Amino acid sequence: MEISASMVKELRESTGAGMMDCKKALQESNGDMQKAVDILREKGLGKAAKKADRLASEGLVSVVVSENNKTATITEINSETDFVAKNATFVDLVKNTTIHVQTNSINTVEELKESSINGVKFEEYFQSQIATIGENLVVRRFETIKAAKGGIVAGYIHSNSRVGVLIGAACDSEETAAKIHDFLRNLCMHAAAMKPQVISYKEFDADFVEKEYLALKGELEKENEELVRLKKPLHKIPEFASRAQLTDDIIAKATENLKAELKKQGKPEAIWDKILPGQIDRYIADNTQLDQRLTLLGQFYVMDDKKTVEQAIADEAKKVGGKVEIVSYVRFEVGEGLEKKSEDFAAEVAAQMA
């Protein structure tokens, strides 16, 4: 297959890899863009081609949490320009839409269009707002989470109103739920900053983990080439990338290897129990870098980076004398996942509305 300059340009823009490296990857993949991305990543030559890295819209995200902290809704509405995104009328529209979605238990955009607000159909109301504001607008998405008995939800909207997060927790009692509200909101702030994609490694499938491990390995090996040149300490190449790969047998084998190393170092066996827990934690941390990048529970907590979010939750539960489990998580960032195909975003918004 002939590799065109536009294909090379597209791959280069999406991965940040060099032009010749992109051309070779496309030749090797016979023009398959996704395979070319994987080839570059395994060689440590490019980042994942994430559509979210090429934000193509303006707009706002809104979060509304009910007074009893049992229901939370998040909404994204897109505009053509950031100027309109700062317009007070548009800000009110986004908030009112979020309240309307939550109050009326609306689940889909079609349901929203057919619903009534202020005595008229929502679609009619929305079109009148477009006329007032003077730009094409689109309700891109919304989601509501609800807490079960004994549970609680929390939400956070960043100061620029472009990033919002909802988190829901199951608790053993209403008392526990009330006590962890502020902590849960801090977790929302953490997620806004650190961008986890899922709650836990348990949501990964095996093929995804294997592909990401190869990409991580390639990335570290490439960085080590530069560290050799600079005569600096090298990255240790992990055996694994996720807790999903760390079976009980693998942990047991790692523990035996650590014991053998302690024996080799001449450490008295009587103190092994004091040393091993920290070394096992270090082994797990070294071999769960994918979890640290993409999972909420696996990331190191921004409020205390000596512990993971999972550990922070366990500590908080112990502190309040209850049980806490994160069961729902939603993060919206304006425009994420929208790929800009042209400079005419008005046309793109119009296409979404059609």
UniProtKB/Swiss-Prot annotation:
GO cellular component, as recorded: cytoplasm
GO molecular-function terms, A-Z: translation elongation factor activity
Cited NCBIfam families: tsf
UniProtKB keywords: Cytoplasm, Elongation factor, Protein biosynthesis
Database matches in PANTHER family: ELONGATION FACTOR TS (PTHR11741), ELONGATION FACTOR TS, MITOCHONDRIAL (PTHR11741:SF0)
Protein location: Cytoplasm
Domain of life, per lineage: Bacteria
Region of interest (Involved in Mg(2+) ion dislocation from EF-Tu), ranges: 81-84
Gene source species: Campylobacter fetus subsp. fetus (strain 82-40)
InterPro entries: EF-Ts_dimer_sf, Transl_elong_EFTs/EF1B, Transl_elong_EFTs/EF1B_dimer, Transl_elong_Ts_CS, UBA-like_sf
Name of the protein this chain belongs to: Elongation factor Ts
Family, per entry: Belongs to the EF-Ts family.
Biological function: Associates with the EF-Tu.GDP complex and induces the exchange of GDP to GTP. It remains bound to the aminoacyl-tRNA.EF-Tu.GTP complex up to the GTP hydrolysis stage on the ribosome.
Gene3D superfamilies: 1.10.286.20, DNA helicase RuvA subunit, C-terminal domain, Elongation factor Ts, dimerisation domain
Gene from which this protein is expressed: tsf
HAMAP family membership: EF_Ts
Record flagged with keyword Protein biosynthesis: yes
